Amino acid sequence: MAKSSLKAKQKKHAKFSTRAYTRCELCGRVHAVLRKYKICRICFRELAHQGKIPGMKKASW
C-alpha cells in the first residue's frame, strides 16, 4: 500500500508533464490504473462486482 505522503505528493501539480503519474484514488496503487475512472483494476473489479459502477456488468460471450 502507498504511504499517505506519496498520496499527498501525487495530488500536487507536477512542474513538468513527464513527471506526472496516475495513482489509484482508493488504494494508492500506481500500476494498472484506469484513467477514465482514476482507480486501479483491482478496485475497479471489486466496485463492479458490488454494483457501484453504473452500467457495468460482467462480460459474457
Swiss-Prot record:
| Taxonomic superkingdom | Bacteria
One of this protein's GO BP terms? translation
Q: Where does Zn(2+) bind?
A: 24, 27, 40, 43
Tell whether Signal is among the UniProt keywords.
Answer: no
Could you say which cofactors this protein requires?
Zn(2+)
Record note on cofactor: Binds 1 zinc ion per subunit.
Q: Name one GO molecular function term.
A: zinc ion binding
Q: Which UniProt keywords apply?
A: Metal-binding, Ribonucleoprotein, Ribosomal protein, RNA-binding, rRNA-binding, Zinc
- Claim: Flavoprotein is one of the keywords in the record: no
Q: What do the Gene Ontology cellular component annotations say?
A: cytoplasm; small ribosomal subunit
Q: Which Pfam families match?
A: Ribosomal_S14
Q: What does this protein do?
A: Binds 16S rRNA, required for the assembly of 30S particles and may also be responsible for determining the conformation of the 16S rRNA at the A site.
Assembly and partners? Part of the 30S ribosomal subunit. Contacts proteins S3 and S10.
The similarity comment for this entry is: Belongs to the universal ribosomal protein uS14 family. Zinc-binding uS14 subfamily.
- Name of protein: Small ribosomal subunit protein uS14
Organism expressing this protein natively? Mycoplasmopsis agalactiae (strain NCTC 10123 / CIP 59.7 / PG2)
Provide the organism lineage as a comma list.
Bacteria, Bacillati, Mycoplasmatota, Mycoplasmoidales, Metamycoplasmataceae
